[in-house]
């Protein structure tokens, strides 16, 4: 008897559709620990108006509990875009999001970030009925807070083959998205040579790139190198005009 194939949920399908339609897509990352829900809603509205495809909510430190729940709830009540959780641990889950990037930090030295938090979180995700999107997460130098918190063996910036090997392992493990992360607030993004190497290794798996993306030109170069989804968080928070910042990136990456 043939077993039923795994079905892709509506949020993940929406990401695929956006990439297929426009060549690439933008995701806005909002950290509940960085601002109150009211400010988060303002950022989300501006990003939505500018053409971001979905809103990620999470962070390396403090994105848990009531701050997370209130932020997700406020955004859901105000913005008609999918809200995807971006948890650093099982504590970064709540029941009012649309989906979760269910990820393993592939180059972590700690089993906590490779599989233990995932085992703790899986029953919660199932009980909440949140769409789980399987993702391999790879942290590249300098790594920022997430590299330290996640005890990552950082991929050297001049070693694209190492990133490609981790990414290919993620693909073979069944992860449908691979995320290259330079770290929140990094001075520069993941090198384009590394993005290209990973793109070649993982075929049609969705490739996400985040960290250190501070302007539209940087985003455009990453997409030209092979990125499908561009994530900005710190850049959005620090921009004086969220709409303009996101709009410039969205315009630059659409082909």
From Swiss-Prot:
<comment type="function">
    <text>Prenyltransferase that catalyzes the transfer of the geranylgeranyl moiety of geranylgeranyl diphosphate (GGPP) to the C3 hydroxyl of sn-glycerol-1-phosphate (G1P). This reaction is the first ether-bond-formation step in the biosynthesis of archaeal membrane lipids.</text>
</comment>
<keyword id="KW-0479">Metal-binding</keyword>
<dbReference type="GO" id="GO:0000287">
    <property type="term" value="F:magnesium ion binding"/>
</dbReference>
<feature type="binding site">
    <location>
        <position position="31"/>
    </location>
    <ligand>
        <name>Mg(2+)</name>
    </ligand>
</feature>
<protein>
    <recommendedName>
        <fullName>Geranylgeranylglyceryl phosphate synthase</fullName>
        <ecNumber>2.5.1.41</ecNumber>
    </recommendedName>
</protein>
<feature type="binding site">
    <location>
        <begin position="233"/>
        <end position="234"/>
    </location>
    <ligand>
        <name>sn-glycerol 1-phosphate</name>
    </ligand>
</feature>
<feature type="binding site">
    <location>
        <begin position="211"/>
        <end position="212"/>
    </location>
    <ligand>
        <name>sn-glycerol 1-phosphate</name>
    </ligand>
</feature>
<dbReference type="Pfam" id="PF01884">
    <property type="entry name" value="PcrB"/>
</dbReference>
<dbReference type="GO" id="GO:0046474">
    <property type="term" value="P:glycerophospholipid biosynthetic process"/>
</dbReference>
<dbReference type="InterPro" id="IPR039074">
    <property type="entry name" value="GGGP/HepGP_synthase_I"/>
</dbReference>
<keyword id="KW-0963">Cytoplasm</keyword>
<dbReference type="InterPro" id="IPR038597">
    <property type="entry name" value="GGGP/HepGP_synthase_sf"/>
</dbReference>
<dbReference type="InterPro" id="IPR010946">
    <property type="entry name" value="GGGP_synth"/>
</dbReference>
<dbReference type="InterPro" id="IPR008205">
    <property type="entry name" value="GGGP_HepGP_synthase"/>
</dbReference>
<feature type="binding site">
    <location>
        <position position="60"/>
    </location>
    <ligand>
        <name>Mg(2+)</name>
    </ligand>
</feature>
<comment type="similarity">
    <text>Belongs to the GGGP/HepGP synthase family. Group II subfamily.</text>
</comment>
<comment type="pathway">
    <text>Membrane lipid metabolism; glycerophospholipid metabolism.</text>
</comment>
<keyword id="KW-0443">Lipid metabolism</keyword>
<keyword id="KW-0594">Phospholipid biosynthesis</keyword>
<keyword id="KW-0460">Magnesium</keyword>
<dbReference type="GO" id="GO:0047294">
    <property type="term" value="F:phosphoglycerol geranylgeranyltransferase activity"/>
</dbReference>
<dbReference type="GO" id="GO:0005737">
    <property type="term" value="C:cytoplasm"/>
</dbReference>
<keyword id="KW-0808">Transferase</keyword>
<feature type="binding site">
    <location>
        <begin position="179"/>
        <end position="185"/>
    </location>
    <ligand>
        <name>sn-glycerol 1-phosphate</name>
    </ligand>
</feature>
<keyword id="KW-1208">Phospholipid metabolism</keyword>
<keyword id="KW-0444">Lipid biosynthesis</keyword>
């Amino acid at each position: 008897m043939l077993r039923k194939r795994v079905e892709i949920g509506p949020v993940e399908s929406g990401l695929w559709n956006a990439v297929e339609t426009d060549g690439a897509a933008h995701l806005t990352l909002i950290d509940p620990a960085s601002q109150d829900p009211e400010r988060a809603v303002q950022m989300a509205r501006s990003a939505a108006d500018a053409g971001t495809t979905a809103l990620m909510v999470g962070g390396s430190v403090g994105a848990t509990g009531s701050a997370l729940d209130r932020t997700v709830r406020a955004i859901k009540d105000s913005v008609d875009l999918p809200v995807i959780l971006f948890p650093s641990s099982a504590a970064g889950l709540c029941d009012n999001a649309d989906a979760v990037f269910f990820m393993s930090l592939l180059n972590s030295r700690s089993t906590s970030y490779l599989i233990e938090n995932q085992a703790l979180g899986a029953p919660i995700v199932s009980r909440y009925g949140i769409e789980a999107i399987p993702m391999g997460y790879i942290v590249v130098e300098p790594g920022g807070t997430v590299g330290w918190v996640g005890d990552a063996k950082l991929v050297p910036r001049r070693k694209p083959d190492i990133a490609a090997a981790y990414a290919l392992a993620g693909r073979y493990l069944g992860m449908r998205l691979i995320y290259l992360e330079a770290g929140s607030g990094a001075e520069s993004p993941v090198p384009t040579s590394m993005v290209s190497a990973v793109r070649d290794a993982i075929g049609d798996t969705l490739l996400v790139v985040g960290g250190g993306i501070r302007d539209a030109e940087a985003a455009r170069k990453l997409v030209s190198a092979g990125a499908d989804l561009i994530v900005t968080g710190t850049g959005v928070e620090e921009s004086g005009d969220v709409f303009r910042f996101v709009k410039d990136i969205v315009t630059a990456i659409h082909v």
